[in-house]
């Protein structure tokens, strides 16, 4: 039977009705999750069709086992994203015969034994690419690569160390397209490795390792040495009793560098590796192939080589009865019932994944390539199949933690809210483990279950203390899944649940968004024009559950409130002082550590800090994370990579008074006299049909001045396309007039000079260029300069086109990973735009926009 197809507009309108007018959620669903073929045909009209597809497939697996759950009941759990939300890969892939891809969200690869040869490294590189083309994020550990300068028996004579291979793996990630986005990669290394300092510094060089997240695996011994000021011993191999290389380092100095780099650029992340291994249930089976070596790209699933995980989130907000009222209460009975079903559904999805692996292997077999070419990919999926079926690992998580707490009248970051969040997570953990034990009775335990191996595991001991009867049942019957739980960032799925994401607080209860408009329509207001000439109107957006709070408290949601009114509303709401940038930072870290006790995998969470915090605060947060039992910690200091949503509220100064005293901010360093010669980058760009070139003068590697003009025309600037760097030379005449020349070396080393850059400018642009160079000279933060350029209100269409080119040229110098303040992704609407090589990339949906 030929399947019915829908036009984009049909699907969008049906989804718009489904989401009750939420245009952003509707577009996200149609663009990312509706079933499509490679020709763009859409086979689902609304999320109801998708949920029916998922329910039918999961029920098909249920029918293989005793006491099957019906498709109708499963659909009821999924419908309107109310209770259970599979992550993107399962949601897209289950029952989808239009693509051959894995249902797994994340993988870790690696080689057991010696893995420091070129052959082993190239093999991991190929495996990484093969997984990413099937939609998976990948992590792998570099601790087995020998340190720089080690003797090798090849023509090089000594090893190059870790960093060149970081760049190789990063570049491979950037080459792979997954639904129009790049792959996700995590690279980790042990702090014991002699090259760990080079690893920690690798991303501090602009443009390096831009395709990977990097995290350093820190052991308890290092932390104690760093805190107590004692030396620490590094060695290679890191676990060898008789290492080939040893050196003693200043642990405090290396720790200070980790803190500084995290403060400056949000990387590296830290993984408290002894905590991870000590708490890991799969590591009870390390000698059977379940030794944890790295994590997935977001850090919430530590994994052994060739294992994978599929994720699912439970919407906590939906279990609050009478939300935002004095009668609000959490329905623990319904929650336990649904957690048990969620764990069961996750186990069913493992069977569906094994079916997908069958299809992948058949596809590989049928490919026309030579058998030798196909061998690595085929064997890769064989290893993944083996680990998947052997451990049956699941990732049951949560979302809407922030909204749940607000709906109950609890302020995120307080001790009361933390205690309740721990109670909810403990309830979830016990219910999920009880469900896994019940499935072991009905379906059989995972193949290598051994109660004796697990009896001293701290997580299992907590289960035993909390529910002795469950523990005894588990010892008798086993458990269906080697590990069950996680808390992941829920990304775009939180747009469809219309809640806060994962364990995070609300980002902003009120913010600005842009809507494309017809600039010729007299009824609209144009606030922004992008590089293509599209016009946008800015408007105020309320977080969905903030609107629910307003309605529950009899506040008119249709009124056009002033900024002062909005500020008063937020201040009187349960979201006051509970946003991502407002929460008590130490309490957030302690909350993560407390909840971690009831999560057998890990938690992905970010501590958002204002720009003016000191490195000492970052140090205290990291140390507190280690002491609190966190398995990892990520710090993001506002502006360290620049860019987030624009808050509508008036700025309130927040200090570190509760933690440490903040030193006065030093004024920017300004060079009063321009050097006669500045290094210069040449940046080419195209606006409409015109080719432009920008000469960006650099002082200390930072833009100091800019000249732009047309190239390749009679009056323009003619340069070989190979020229990307040079010097801007300033000449001052006897009459005080100034001239700026561009000088470069050709391939043969001869200098060529292009005289009179200022004369190459159209006079129409000259004053604007002087303005921009002026603010660059006086060290305005670069992202603010770009905002200033973008905000220029210019009547001439030509100048508007030119200013976009200037923005594009300057964006090149914003550090990769810098968040884009005040901008939302035009595709998914999330506040997750970051700068990457001068382009804006959405971390959630992968949409990119350059210019």
Residue positions per predicted region:
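Terminal amphipathic helices with adjacent charged low-complexity linkers/tails
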Residues: 218, 279, 284-286, 296, ...
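Cysteine-rich micro-motifs
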Residues: 838-848
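Short, Gly/Pro- and small/polar-rich lid/capping loops
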Residues: 471-473, 648-698
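Internal maturation/activation junctions in enzymes
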Residues: 74-75, 235-239, 338-385, 389, ...
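Short, cysteine/histidine-rich loop/knuckle motifs that typically chelate Zn2+
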Residues: 826-830, 844
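Conserved, charged catalytic cores of large soluble enzymes
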Residues: 2-68, 154-168, 178-290, 321-326, ...
